[in-house]
């Protein structure tokens, strides 16, 4: 952003008084790094710490941020404020030092709320679909020439980054319910894609508590704000009478304000019609597969229509949509002759989905777009608590693929829970008689096990939220050939 653009932005968004140096503890996460990137481009001095370098820390370093790959008290001593990731514990030496030095320590969402305070905020919440919907809204606003600021939990492929500082009054952000920190946000528009039982430790295992928290989030909207909600979701439909704000609904349901109809999928593209009240029909070509992505697009269109964005810009943005990182991310198609001597090819797709509903949506999109391909899934369960709480749902959904290779649970810092491990889940799936899953206890053996499982005209889904994304990239780099991958 040049000096003239920054001056224009400052007329909308004033500087934070007494804040020059902002330190992030856990800066390598997509959400933390995205906020740091926006603030760096606003001219603040940025530093941060994490345990290992990654693409996020590399990008921030190129913007002039000072990144430490250790947690030490001295890292924070010159900071005006310290922003902390939800993954960081209170005994972290940087947090202790900041408190001792009377430096304010705030959560990530509090800083995001500050970025949103003087802007027209659009916050996207929900159990599933937040990241993709955030990217779709961003793409439409960018196509319309509105140059929004955005902060997303995943890579926006068209922009090549998780976040970007725009020159307009618009801020589009993913809102995280996992630790209830989205209650800090006070947007003008809020999307809720769906509500399911997830992150239940945050809500004391009480689903009513989770539902009320979403209501409280929506009541952070001003009385003239807009709630955009998916009426196909049974929980959302139940909650509608309790939302005391203007509501626009969307979905496949007949009573949706923005209604998806005539959906069909050809390869990776969805084709459908959007019906809007008192507006022309939109005939949409969406460059993203699956009925779930048609719903995400409908939410984005509802917001854009309310803002008065031209229909042509909306349609162009959806047809050109490049997606987000690790959301049905096509990595390549490789001949099997060099992999295992078989004829035919195998497509490789990487996907972040780690909840049964998300995995089911990904499987359905794969089946609809490539009905003649055999579906081979490499799945890494994420968290023992989630595996325990949704055990039967996982067993049902994972039984729908043709071949299943399952890695050990990615713990995300949790202690093992008896009966909520990958071996138990494989045993349960095998007992249901549809498929015989392969338990992969040593990740180094996966390329060879995968090569033995491929038969030609396969679609490989690498599925999960842990470190499995790195494995997907290794498989792509090796073109699925086990001798190179090892």
From Swiss-Prot:
This is UDP-N-acetylmuramate--L-alanine ligase. GO terms for biological process: cell division; cell wall organization; peptidoglycan biosynthetic process; regulation of cell shape. NCBIfam families: murC. It is an enzyme of class 6 (ligase). GO terms for cellular component: cytoplasm. It catalyses: UDP-N-acetyl-alpha-D-muramate + L-alanine + ATP = UDP-N-acetyl-alpha-D-muramoyl-L-alanine + ADP + phosphate + H(+). It is found in: Cytoplasm. ATP binds at residues 126-132. Keywords: ATP-binding, Cell cycle, Cell division, Cell shape, Cell wall biogenesis/degradation, Cytoplasm, Ligase, Nucleotide-binding, Peptidoglycan synthesis. Its EC number is 6.3.2.8. Pathway: Cell wall biogenesis; peptidoglycan biosynthesis. Cell wall formation. Belongs to the MurCDEF family. Its main location: cytoplasm. It holds the Pfam family Mur_ligase_C. One of its GO terms (molecular function) is UDP-N-acetylmuramate-L-alanine ligase activity. PANTHER family: UDP-N-ACETYLMURAMATE--L-ALANINE LIGASE (PTHR43445:SF3), UDP-N-ACETYLMURAMATE--L-ALANINE LIGASE-RELATED (PTHR43445).
